A protein has these predicted regions:
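Conserved ankyrin/ankyrin-like repeat signature
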Residues: 74, 106-107, 139-140, 172-173, ...
Length: 317
């Protein structure tokens, strides 16, 4: 015998009403979500990506992406839709700093026009001016300076835009920064100035520009080294002719070749130890002392021989 159970009418109505009510809620949710201007905000397409205009995170990410890739009209639209020009990425960069680094001049102009902070520093302490200078974006540098960007702000390593430009060998930007009040005497956290970096890298034209500001050649920097010593002890990646030209320029400005550093070494001794034959030859030619002994009692000849620079040692004998 089979038995059947019929759900009471009252119970059937209760189940139907529950299911129907849930369905209505779900349908209403999707209806509101898909409304172009519903309570969930307007959805716009930015470079093929749907962006909800009430979602500040989506707007700001879209702004960073548009700035990074130089999409001017997208940047304009996003700022009009409410993307924050104050928003920062994980490095502390605002849209302006990104645009400056990438060299997107028109976007830089737009962001400044809508109120971006010209002096904002990211987590490394870099300003938009520093970002543009380091990346060799001269047109952006020029515009930022014309917009009254602070020229001597240093980052967390105490690097200024002028130091960055000198390190890069960017003579025109060095000249531009100096004309807007850049201070050539400022040092980084290692005690080096723009002039020290330019001297050590053989950028003679930049050295000339910086010396023309009135800096004395006898000033000592880290480890009591003068700029002549930095030039004489240049690294091997610096072309020898560029280094020699820099040494000659510094000497022509009155540098004393016989000053010693904290180790008791002269420019001649430093050049001898590094094996820089042409510089040793030039220093000897102008009468640099070759019998000076450092704090360990070594002469230029001793230093050359200790590093197996036979050609330099032969010249010094």
């Amino acid at each position: 015998m089979t038995s059947s159970y019929k759900i009471p009418k009252e119970r059937r109505l209760q189940v139907y009403n529950t299911v129907s009510g849930s369905s209505v809620i779900v349908l209403l949710f999707w209806y509101l979500l898909l409304l172009p201007n519903g309570i969930f905000g307007k959805t716009v397409m930015i470079n093929g990506v749907a962006v909800n205009t009430t979602n500040s995170r989506q707007l700001n990410f879209a702004l960073f992406d548009a700035v990074e890739y130089g999409r001017m009209e997208d940047v304009r639209q996003l700022t009009e839709l409410g993307a924050s020009i104050k928003a920062r990425n994980r490095f502390g960069n605002t849209a302006l700093l990104i645009a400056a680094r990438k060299g997107h001049l028109k976007i830089v102009q737009l962001l400044l026009d809508v109120g971006s902070d010209l002096q904002h520093q990211n987590l490394a302490g870099n300003t938009a001016l520093f970002q543009a200078t380091k990346a060799r974006r001269r047109k952006v540098v020029k515009y930022l300076l014309a917009s009254k960007a602070a020229v001597n702000v240093a980052n967390r390593q105490q690097l200024t835009p002028l130091i960055a430009a000198a390190y890069n060998g960017d003579r025109k930007t060095v000249q531009l920064l100096l004309s807007h009040g850049a201070d050539p005497t400022l040092t980084d956290q290692t005690g080096k100035t723009a002039l020290v970096y330019a001297s050590g890298k053989g950028f003679s034209k930049i050295v000339g520009l910086l010396l023309d500001t009135g800096i004395e050649t006898s000033i000592r920097y880290g480890n009591e080294l003068t700029i002549l010593m930095w030039a004489a002890g240049h690294s091997d990646d610096v072309p020898s002719q560029a280094a020699l030209k820099t040494v000659k320029l510094i000497l022509s400005k009155g540098a004393n070749p016989d000053l010693v550093d904290k180790r008791g070494q002269t420019a001649l001794m430093i050049a001898a130890e590094m094996g820089h034959l042409s510089i040793v030859e030039h220093l000897l030619g102008i009468g640099a002392m070759d019998d000076v002994r450092d704090i360990e009692g070594r002469t230029a000849l001793d230093l050359a021989e200790s590093e197996n620079h036979a050609d330099v040692a032969k010249l010094l004998r």
